[in-house]
A protein has these predicted regions:
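A generic "folded-domain core" signal
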Residues: 22-193
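Alpha-helical transmembrane anchor segments and their immediate juxtamembrane flanks
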Residues: 1-28
Length: 193
């Protein structure tokens, strides 16, 4: 099984090296689609602008009937990685509460692999909240070994900062793509229920 994984990884690295055009970039998302609204109403002064806030979802743990809570925020911009992760790659911050684990902070990339190694001390992201100083937050990898998600180690400090911040910038290195910055802006800071 290890031999198969190593061979597959080598093939992907080879293909990526052959196709690599070094044109990865972070581009703003197109939040304003080119659509035109047609209204029969005479009164058009009711332009409602929705506030950008953290998304909240919950579910019930069937084992102990406890409520799991998830607060998530998707980046305003995205990275456009080369093969095999082509397409818009957004970063998502998720604050998770589960009775059996407590509070966690997860960072998840849509397409791509986060690079960081605990042995070499490179398992961290750089984060800036509002106009504060840049801070390092070390992370752990998930138990399943996936590279698209990491768990922030000092979750309580990170959550405390999210409760007051309206702008967050996260910088992370990605496999064969280098370092990218993702920006998050909300009209309301994290409010936990």
């Amino acid at each position: 099984m290890k031999k198969f994984i190593v061979i597959t990884l080598c093939v992907l690295v080879f293909i990526g090296a052959c196709i690599n055009s070094n044109n990865s970039s972070v581009a703003p998302s197109d939040e304003t689609a080119n659509t035109e609204e047609v209204s029969d109403s005479v009164n058009t002064d009711t332009n409602e602008v929705s506030e950008k806030t953290w998304d909240f979802t919950s579910d019930t743990d069937d084992m102990d009937d406890s409520v799991n809570k998830y607060y998530s925020l998707r980046s305003d911009n995205f990275a456009n990685f080369d093969f095999p992760y082509q397409g818009d790659s957004y970063l998502t911050i998720t604050v998770r509460y589960m009775k059996k684990y407590g509070y966690d902070v997860l960072l998840n990339i849509d397409n791509g692999q986060m690079v960081g190694n605990e042995f070499n001390g490179t398992n961290y992201v750089r984060v800036r909240f509002d106009n504060g100083k840049v801070e390092k937050y070390y992370y752990s990898e998930p138990n399943d070994g996936s590279a698209d998600c990491v768990f922030i180690k000092n979750a309580s400090k990170f959550i405390k900062k999210c409760k007051t911040a309206k702008t967050i910038i996260i910088e992370q290195e990605f496999y064969q793509e280098g370092v990218h910055q993702f920006k998050f802006h909300v009209d309301k800071s994290l409010e936990m229920k």
